[in-house]
């Protein structure tokens, strides 16, 4: 009869603890890039929609991640990964 392999990996922290730590990190980053009023209103909307549940926590994390990603792609002044806005010159020298 087959037996399940023993857990040989490192001890992992509980999912809930990890999720709350992730939320704190994302909130700290969001506060650096967005007005607090916007973030408060987003939090209120999530709370009104999901209440005080883990689904609400996950929705807030997902929304903040999407907002930060778009913010960085558009070209955050603090970021090195934003789209660089360059003007193209017609009939200019080609890159080869």
Curated annotation (Swiss-Prot):
One of its GO terms (biological process) is regulation of DNA-templated transcription. Gene3D superfamilies: 6.10.210.10, VpR/VpX protein, C-terminal domain. Residues 1-42 are annotated as: Homooligomerization. Signal peptide: none annotated. Keywords: Activator, AIDS, Apoptosis, Cell cycle, Host G2/M cell cycle arrest by virus, Host nucleus, Host-virus interaction, Ion channel, Ion transport, Modulation of host cell cycle by virus, Phosphoprotein, Transcription, Transcription regulation, Transport, Viral penetration into host nucleus, Virion, Virus entry into host cell. GO terms for cellular component: host cell; host cell nucleus; host extracellular space; virion component. The modification Phosphoserine is found at residues 79, 94, 96. Phosphorylated on several residues by host. These phosphorylations regulate VPR activity for the nuclear import of the HIV-1 pre-integration complex. It is found in: Virion; Host nucleus; Host extracellular space. Homooligomer, may form homodimer. Interacts with p6-gag region of the Pr55 Gag precursor protein through a (Leu-X-X)4 motif near the C-terminus of the P6gag protein. Interacts with host UNG. May interact with host RAD23A/HHR23A. Interacts with host VPRBP/DCAF1, leading to hijack the CUL4A-RBX1-DDB1-DCAF1/VPRBP complex, mediating ubiquitination of host proteins such as TERT and ZGPAT and arrest of the cell cycle in G2 phase. During virus replication, may deplete host UNG protein, and incude G2-M cell cycle arrest. Acts by targeting specific host proteins for degradation by the 26S proteasome, through association with the cellular CUL4A-DDB1 E3 ligase complex by direct interaction with host VPRPB/DCAF-1. Cell cycle arrest reportedly occurs within hours of infection and is not blocked by antiviral agents, suggesting that it is initiated by the VPR carried into the virion. Additionally, VPR induces apoptosis in a cell cycle dependent manner suggesting that these two effects are mechanistically linked. During virus entry, plays a role in the transport of the viral pre-integration (PIC) complex to the host nucleus. This function is crucial for viral infection of non-dividing macrophages. May act directly at the nuclear pore complex, by binding nucleoporins phenylalanine-glycine (FG)-repeat regions. HIV-1 lineages are divided in three main groups, M (for Major), O (for Outlier), and N (for New, or Non-M, Non-O). The vast majority of strains found worldwide belong to the group M. Group O seems to be endemic to and largely confined to Cameroon and neighboring countries in West Central Africa, where these viruses represent a small minority of HIV-1 strains. The group N is represented by a limited number of isolates from Cameroonian persons. The group M is further subdivided in 9 clades or subtypes (A to D, F to H, J and K). Belongs to the HIV-1 VPR protein family. This is Protein Vpr. The gene is vpr.
């Amino acid at each position: 009869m087959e037996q399940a392999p023993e857990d040989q990996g490192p001890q992992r922290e509980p999912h809930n603890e990890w999720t709350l730590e992730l939320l704190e990190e994302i909130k700290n980053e969001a506060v650096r890039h967005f007005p607090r009023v916007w973030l408060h209103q987003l939090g209120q909307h999530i709370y009104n929609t999901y209440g005080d549940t883990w689904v609400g926590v996950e929705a807030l994390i997902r929304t903040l991640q999407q907002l930060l990603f778009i913010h960085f792609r558009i070209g955050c002044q603090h970021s090195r990964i934003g789209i660089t806005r360059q003007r193209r010159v017609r009939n200019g020298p080609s890159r080869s």
